[in-house]
Curated annotation (Swiss-Prot):
Coiled coil: none annotated. SUPFAM superfamilies: ATPase domain of HSP90 chaperone/DNA topoisomerase II/histidine kinase. Keywords: ATP-binding, Kinase, Nucleotide-binding, Serine/threonine-protein kinase, Sporulation, Transferase. Binds to sigma F and blocks its ability to form an RNA polymerase holoenzyme (E-sigma F). Phosphorylates SpoIIAA on a serine residue. This phosphorylation may enable SpoIIAA to act as an anti-anti-sigma factor that counteracts SpoIIAB and thus releases sigma F from inhibition. It holds the Pfam family HATPase_c_2. It comes from Pasteuria penetrans. Its EC number is 2.7.11.1. Belongs to the anti-sigma-factor family. This is Anti-sigma F factor. CDD domains: HATPase_SpoIIAB-like (cd16942). It catalyses: L-seryl-[protein] + ATP = O-phospho-L-seryl-[protein] + ADP + H(+); L-threonyl-[protein] + ATP = O-phospho-L-threonyl-[protein] + ADP + H(+). The keyword Nucleotide-binding applies. One of its GO terms (molecular function) is sigma factor antagonist activity. It is an enzyme of class 2 (transferase).
């Protein structure tokens, strides 16, 4: 059984979304995922971190942090994105396609739908005034590393 874990925390700024996406992808690369699997993971990290930055705190809130942790076990990847922002009043409503608390923004309201499409499991816990935890799990195909026998 292969098991590994990493955690990072950064200021809630949209510029840090790319850092989180790349760091998680680099960590998961040790499992030798397919390009599609890696793209799915990068996409959901981008969506979850962007949601935390925009909705939890407002853009680039000094002292407000987003935490991303990743745990791999065998071929399963578990990603958790946590903020201590405003929280979500109605999680089920927020998970509905096209629902957004920011209707003035083009392309808003698809974050949770995208996460649910690319991951095997998505759980959201939120308490208004205390923050939100998004936990996502994806089972990767078996490692493609094949021994060459002469």
């Amino acid at each position: 059984m292969k098991r590994n874990r990493m955690e990072m925390e950064f200021t809630s700024c949209s510029e840090n979304e790319a850092f989180a996406r790349i760091a998680v992808a680099a960590f998961v690369a040790q499992l030798d995922p397919t390009l599609e699997e890696l793209t799915d993971i990068k996409t959901v990290v981008s969506e979850a971190v962007t949601n935390a930055v925009i909705h939890a705190y407002g853009e680039c809130s000094e002292g407000m942090m987003v935490r991303v942790s990743v745990e791999i076990e065998d071929t399963q990847v578990a990603i958790t994105v946590t903020d201590r922002g405003v929280g979500i009043v109605d999680v089920e409503q927020a998970r509905q396609p096209l629902y957004t608390s920011r209707p003035e923004w083009e392309r808003a309201g698809m974050g949770f739908s995208i996460m649910e499409h690319f991951m095997d499991q998505v759980r959201v816990r939120s308490t208004p005034g205390q923050g939100t935890v998004v936990h996502m799990i994806k089972k990767l195909q078996a490692s493609r590393n094949v021994a060459v026998v002469n």
